[in-house]
């Protein structure tokens, strides 16, 4: 089945990790086929939180990345709920384990891409959004920025990149306590090949994978529910560059790549709101 964040978000009563019992300790690892992240490897990774009515806690709903001391890049579908206000969200930065000494940042503005649109099988286009924090963050080894690509950067099929998050470790299998951030290496899959896979599985004749989408992953190596909005990064000339934003997929870790918003398609839009220096 398709994994769509809106099916698991706390305001719909879905399954979301909550604050761990201090007595629980599990060593199982995930994203899908992933490993625990060493400290300070991905200092731009953030957790987007929503105040769950049932738990009374700020629950993790999506990932995101810090691209400016006061701005977070995430997926539009993470913040697509009609009437959702910035004041109902929080962002946690510099954390490897969810809910471990939370110091949540207030969100003051949500900017969804105006072309964002949902279809029955996923998202047609522009699954990208910006969140403005209440105040600029002080950068450090634990909290830092990821570089964005230039709009002309070409990410070749077969290139190995990394996706990170606190999402499910398999279909309907949440990341267990202590909710340690996961990473997995995934190969880039060309849009034509990716589109053929999805046309077949979804029985669609129309184009499924648009030009502003990017595919990555292989059997047993994938992002999953609750990873949405998180970064797909590639090592480029000794610099980590964010090339994708986790968007949607069919199952988790099957022999189908995950689908990401292609960051190069939206760098110019991002610059309209945030003054940034492009990467390679």
UniProtKB/Swiss-Prot annotation:
Protein modification: N-glycosylated.
Tissue specificity: Mononuclear cells within skin, intestine, trachea and lung parenchyma, and polymorphonuclear leukocytes within capillaries and blood.
Signal peptide: 1-15
SUPFAM superfamilies, per the entry: Trypsin-like serine proteases
EC annotation from Swiss-Prot or TrEMBL: 3.4.21.-
Cystine pairings recorded for this chain: 62-78, 161-234, 194-215, 224-252
InterPro entries: Peptidase_S1_PA (IPR009003), Peptidase_S1_PA_chymotrypsin (IPR043504), Peptidase_S1A (IPR001314), Trypsin_dom (IPR001254), TRYPSIN_HIS (IPR018114)
One annotated Gene Ontology cellular component of this protein: cytoplasm
Keyword Protease on entry: yes
Self-association state and partner proteins as the record states: Oligomer; disulfide-linked.
Record-stated family: Belongs to the peptidase S1 family.
Record's protein name: Mastin
Organism phylogeny: Eukaryota, Metazoa, Chordata, Craniata, Vertebrata
